[in-house]
Every structure is written in structure tokens, then in C-alpha cells.
Amino acid sequence: MSSNKIIIANWKQNGSLRTLQSLTSQIIKALKLKSISHSVVLLPPYVYLPILAKKVTSAKTLRNLSIGVQNVSAFSDGAYTGEVSFEMCKDFR
């Protein structure tokens, strides 16, 4: 029985933009150099998502690398301070 493993890098509240850009570049480079069959998903803090998503999508040859969000609110809208809805996250596509 074969299983496709998923490696998820949830960076939580760690790292500056510069640090996470560098780390993302290093991951892209490593995936290009090594034959890794596992899927890799990067989950940066929301404030860096647009910048790092652009970096990930520019690495078009890497079909096993993707980017996502760390948390989605249970509510679709409303006065929920700090929450991010699924609809808002879809705008990052």
C-alpha cells in the first residue's frame, strides 16, 4: 500500500517577511534539486500570504508545492475581530 505524504509547514506567528522569503526560496530550491514525491504546503502568517503566494506560484515547475492559510473562521461574515472568512481567503487565488 502506497501513501502520498503531505508535509505542512505552518509558520504560525514566526519569522519576518525577509526570513520567510528566504525560507520559501530555500524550499523551492531544495524541491527542484531533490526528487521529492511528497506534497509540500506552506502556511505563512496572513500578512505575508500575498507576497509568498506570488513566489510559490512563480515556481511553476513544482507541482508538489502549494500555499494555504493557517486558519479560517467558522463564520462567513460578521463582527468577529481578527477572524478571516473562507470567502476572504478565496481572494488570494
Positions of PLM-derived features:
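Surface-exposed charge patches
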Residues: E87
